[in-house]
């Protein structure tokens, strides 16, 4: 910092300030008895850099204080006060206390409690997530400035309940919520709220995986599958544009992308060489495409096009070690990817990873097909032809080698059906519908419980609903058995969980030794990607041309729902749909912004242009 010495300013530094410790994961210690005016200062030494960094204006959306929460309960347990804010969120605690000089107050944070009512901090792993405040005399207010935590519960030690007031302050990037969804089912409304709250908790300058444990990193796989839901709910332009700059900067010369951007910790684990990683690296294609469809800005496609090409070419390389049609199957060892990550139908991490042949092959089919579309948009006709052919050959390899040729997987699991159905990999609609019927039968045998991991979860309801299995889709959406979206709601979740079985019906975490080292987060937005289905099929609104220049309203009725509403912000203004059913009557109200056109399709199949 600069200190004034008469008319002369010198750059001076000190280690004697009130912030005694500050760490991203471990928290902050602040001593209010220390004054900077009495600190020992010394002149700063100018560093001679070997590089010439380019200074740029801050590009992204600033992290700011937003919602605040007051505790819903406080219980004395031993020497600690246990507060429940009633809501899981990312942020800090604002402490107002009447204290004595030198009095030490310690605040610890957690998402869940142990059965005895104490904080469960085991799932934080190495993160201490602790804020410590040393009081000056009198009444004072403090909150950490150089860290943040993810939590619902806190323990406060070193002060009496009557002398302290605590407030939860939610922190996230300054993104505007521009979309909304609601319907006649209150559990679905709570699910939508949980999706939004989890997204906010993880939009912390970069799209993180979770806000509480010793990660909080820009995992590419999470935002890859969640981006379509994100752009329905928020204005994501500045936030994602900034992160995509990081993606471009982090791309390897070989074309692969780190698993976390910016690279930190798990960028490439020791078990994984620096290669293309299916679905995780796909973020460089899926995220810009979601932005483009929401806003119609071709600039994001143009900026990311070289990155996309290098990445898809890298995927083609890693997928090409076989002979014949096997040259288009992603047959790498499971340990070199994530496969069907956190699929609840198999218990071990190695089993999730072992499905990489199915998920990786579908990934290459999808990214090359999207890249062909993008090449057409950008006028790169030869590229479009090349990547379209690559996608078609990959789809053919999947269907020829992994299915019986008539819509049945040789090895059946939900994601293995979902991806080729949703991505139109089957050669005919008839075969696709047979595959959807097989998927529905598989889901029914599983009591309509979800069995998909990261790659399949965003698309399973579309795969069913759009291929003659509407009832099956609604059975899965509205199921309250574990694992399911609404089981979490029934269990009291206020955000989206990383693991479908994060808590049993007694409020106890059943996660055993599955190879993930206590990997359980209760604020992890990835499976909230179902929000895309809530907007596009339940409410029935989706763009048919980038930026909603033209869009479709086509509600798919089911599940006993009697009404739904959705609003989205388009470049032309707000577009919305409100529908209701009563007896034999269906009423729909559509708001069409000036300069756009809407195709409305009623449940009886009749259509008109608005």
Where in this protein do the model-derived segments appear?
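Extracellular/oxidizing-compartment recognition motifs
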Residues: 1, 7-213, 221-222, 238-241, ...
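Solvent-exposed loop and edge beta-strand segments that line ligand/cofactor-binding
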Residues: 82-84, 144, 207-220, 268-281, ...
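Extracellular polysaccharide-recognition and catalytic grooves
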Residues: 404, 408-512, 516-518
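Alpha-helical support elements that line or immediately flank enzyme active sites
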Residues: 92-111, 146, 157, 222-251, ...
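Well-ordered alpha-helical segments within folded domains of soluble proteins
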Residues: 219-231, 237-242, 278-290, 357-372, ...
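Active-site acid/base region of carbohydrate-active enzymes
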Residues: 163-194, 198-201, 207-225, 229-260, ...
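Non-catalytic C-terminal accessory modules of carbohydrate-active enzymes
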Residues: 11-33, 54-67, 389, 393, ...
